[in-house]
Structures are given as C-alpha cells and as structure tokens.
C-alpha cells in the first residue's frame, strides 16, 4: 500500500482520538448501522480531499464500512492531524504492516507537496477513481483544468499576478502531462459525481457549470441546511476561539474585534467574540447580511474605517483581497490578523512574505510576527489560511457529524443514481437533510412533535416531512 504521512508511530494515539470522536458523531455511526448490509458504496473508488482530522477519519472509515475504496489527501497544508492520518493508514494492521486507507497528508506541507498529494488521490494504478469528495474544489479543479490542458497539449506558463499556490498547481499539471498524458481526461469520463463541502468550492462548481466544463454531476453539500447552518456557524463559534487561544493566549474580553463578512461563518465569528466580551464590528457588502449584523447588535463599518482601532481582525468572506498590505500598515502594533475563509487570498500574504521591507519572525508553528519598516508589527496566524485548523483542530466532532453525514448520503445518492443527474450542481434533497437533523436531535435528547394528519394537510406537507419548501431559509 502506498501512502505518505508524518509518522506511523502516532497511529495508536490517533486511534484513541478516533474512538472518542465516534461517540460524538451519531450521524455517521447511524449510517454505518443502517447501510451495513446493503453496502451502497460497493464499487465506489473515492478520491477524497478534506482536512485530514480525527473527524475526517471517522468519515473515511464510514465510507469504507459502506463498501467504498478510498484514497485521501488534505485540502489545506496546515490542517492535518498527523495522528489521525497515521491511524487511518495503519487501520486494522500494524505500524510495520499497515492495512488501512492510503493517505497522503501531513501538517506543514509545502505547496509543491500539497499538489503532489492531490495527484496521488487520483493515482489508482490500473483502475480509475469514480467519485470525488472535495472541500474547496482543488481536487475537482485538478481534473477539469488537467483535462483542458491535455486537450490543448500544453499547460500554460504562470502569469505575473498568479499566486504561489497556483504556480505550484500548474507545475503539478505540467509534470503529470509529461509523465501520464491523458490521465485527467480518463478520470473525467470515469467519475460519476463530486460532493463539495464548502462555500468556496461550491462557487467554483457553479463557475465550472456556467463555463460548460463540468464533466460530471456535482452535489452542493455546503448548502444543505444541516451543514451551512450548523458547521459554518456553530462549528466556527467553537473552533475560532480555540485557534486563537492555542496560538496566542490573548484575552478577548474588552478588545476591539473586526470581523470581515457576516455570512454563516462570519455570524459564528461575531457571536464567538461577543461571548468572550469583545467589542465587535462587522464589515459586509451584502445589505441583507449587513442589516442582520445591525439587528444582532454589531456596528457595520468598512475596513478602512475600523482597522486602525482593531486589536483582532478576522476575515470570513470567501472572497479575495479583503485586507491589503496598506491596511495592515495601519493596524495597531502587535494586533492579531487571521482568516477563517477557505483560501489564504483574503489577506495580502504575498506582500508579507515577499517584500524586502517586511521582516518575518516565527513565534511558533503557524504563529508569525511580521515587522514593518515603521517598527510596528502584526501577528498573523497560519499564514493567512484557516486558523481554526492551522492553529487548532477544527470544528468539534458533533457538528462535523452533521456535515459528514450529508457528505456520505450525497456520495450514495450520486453513486447509486448514475444517469439520473445532468452535469450540473444539485443540492441535497430536503428529505435527506431532515433525516440528518433528526438523528442529531435524538442524540441530544430532543423530542420532536408529530403532526396529526389534519395538521399536515392544513400546511400542505406529509406527516413524515419534508416540512419546509426548498426556498425556506431557516
């Protein structure tokens, strides 16, 4: 079995953590019981790219328990929990003779190593992957752009304004084109569908669909209610504070905090800081979200207006160029800057890392002080990447049980219903969304009210649901 992780000797520690996480992930454990005999993913060869955490380990072993074969990489260079990666590789075997799942992930990958790992999840020897499970869209992008450049016969050269990450991506595609011509086209034809975990990846999917280059059906897991309204908000509310505490031990009470973005993730950020006693301001482009922030009690400002007074600045937009180098120069001495959007381009990290008039001092892994020519400095977490995974271990198990149950159900839906979906982007059917919610309500001891037949008819629903129309916003 091929794999590449940091240290297989960490497998026992990882297994203990996985065992504890299983008790906090009732959605996945229920799916294992429900589908144990049916094996709905038998024959599925899943190329998986999600943060290689303890919670993801429970997802991987759920997929294999339902019959799938899996190869896995992380979707972030800093997010891997090395003990979890080791435990998944060892599986039911030993450190000397591992018998688990091929994993290609370790904490602190270089950009070149990251894209090498992504390529490995698509390398199945004589077979081809037939499903993709993605977070952020990098794996899907590799197939789509890889096929495009194969057809052109050339991977284009990097342009002057391309990010270091995109340059590394093109380098990987160039190497594959030389060594394995035709690889990506074959994979594009073999894949039955992709399920996408996060907002950024979903934006990419819709873009590919609009371009007419999406070669297989896609399931938008992010916009399942049991994902976006729970993982994005409640998970962030927990893991953001965890990441900052582990990174800096900074007291948040009384501090001025600027949260950029007030979507579901931004709402979780603002609520988390508010709960710590911080004074929170929000930036937002969407007037509806801005009005929500105001009604929730937060000032709505612009970055330029608020950044000079902020002790902590967090980006949560899923967009690019949110905090410029010029704005960083205006920040307080030793102010904290972090990001909880999927990519590192919300903050102008390129200037921080490449300008001659900026000095970088690493305080500890994923905590860096950048000193400007003025003598002032700022503290940046995880090089502008997801701080809750780079500086901590991500969202708690229970909330990830929601998201990963959605992922598992979406994989089953696409794999078993080949031909019923066009090469477009779909959302998880609401009846399945409600199924995931029901499992977790019961796990928390909640008692659901049962409608009478007359009540159900009165509001135009079935007694067993779904209870809301597709357009309902919750």
Curated annotation (Swiss-Prot):
This is Adenosylhomocysteinase. InterPro entries: Adenosylhomocyst_ase-like_sf, Adenosylhomocysteinase-like, Ado_hCys_hydrolase_NAD-bd, NAD(P)-bd_dom_sf, S-Ado-L-homoCys_hydrolase_CS. One of its GO terms (molecular function) is adenosylhomocysteinase activity. It is found in: Cytoplasm. Coiled coil: none annotated. GO terms for cellular component: cytosol. It catalyses: S-adenosyl-L-homocysteine + H2O = L-homocysteine + adenosine.
């Amino acid at each position: 079995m091929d794999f590449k992780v940091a240290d297989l000797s960490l497998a026992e520690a990882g297994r203990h953590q996985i065992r504890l996480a299983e008790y906090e992930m009732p959605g996945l454990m229920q799916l294992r019981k429900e589908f144990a005999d049916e094996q709905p993913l038998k024959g599925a060869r899943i190329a998986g790219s999600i943060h290689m955490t303890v919670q993801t380990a429970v997802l991987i072993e759920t997929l294999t328990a339902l019959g799938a074969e899996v190869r896995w990489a992380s979707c972030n260079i800093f997010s891997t929990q090395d003990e979890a990666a080791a435990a998944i590789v060892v599986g039911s075997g030993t450190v000397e003779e591992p018998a688990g799942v091929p994993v290609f992930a370790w904490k602190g990958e270089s950009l070149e190593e990251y894209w090498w790992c992504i390529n490995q999840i698509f390398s199945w020897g004589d077979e081809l992957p037939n499903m993709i499970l993605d977070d952020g869209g990098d794996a899907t992008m590799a197939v789509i752009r890889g096929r495009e450049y194969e057809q052109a016969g050339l991977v284009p050269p990097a342009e002057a304004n391309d990010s270091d990450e995109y340059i590394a991506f093109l380098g990987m595609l160039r190497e594959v084109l030389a060594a394995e011509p035709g690889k990506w086209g074959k994979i594009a034809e073999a894949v039955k569908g992709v399920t996408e975990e996060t907002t950024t990846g979903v934006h990419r999917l819709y873009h590919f669909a609009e371009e007419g280059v999406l070669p297989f059906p896609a399931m938008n897991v992010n916009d399942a209610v049991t994902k976006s309204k729970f993982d994005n908000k409640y998970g962030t509310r927990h893991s953001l504070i965890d990441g900052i505490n582990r990174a800096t031990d900074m007291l948040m009470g009384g501090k001025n905090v600027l949260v950029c973005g007030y979507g579901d993730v931004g709402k979780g950020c603002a609520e988390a800081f508010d709960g710590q006693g911080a004074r929170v301001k929000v930036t937002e482009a969407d007037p509806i979200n801005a009005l929500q922030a105001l009604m929730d009690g937060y000032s709505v400002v612009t970055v330029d207006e608020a950044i000079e007074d902020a002790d902590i600045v967090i980006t949560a937009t899923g967009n690019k160029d949110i905090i410029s180098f010029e704005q960083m120069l205006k920040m307080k001495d030793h102010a904290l800057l972090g990001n909880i959007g999927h990519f590192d381009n919300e903050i102008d990290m390129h200037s921080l890392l490449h300008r001659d008039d900026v000095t970088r001092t690493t305080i500890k892994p994923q905590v860096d002080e950048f000193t400007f020519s003025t003598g002032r400095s700022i503290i940046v977490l995880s090089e502008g990447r997801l701080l809750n995974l780079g500086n901590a271990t991500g969202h708690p198990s229970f909330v990830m049980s929601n998201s990963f149950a959605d992922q598992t159900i979406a994989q089953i839906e696409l794999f078993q219903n080949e031909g019923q979906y066009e090469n477009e982007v779909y959302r998880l059917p609401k009846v399945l969304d409600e199924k995931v919610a029901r499992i977790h309500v019961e796990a928390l001891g909640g008692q659901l009210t049962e409608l009478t037949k007359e009540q159900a008819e009165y509001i135009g629903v079935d007694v067993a649901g779904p209870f809301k129309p597709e357009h309902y916003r919750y």
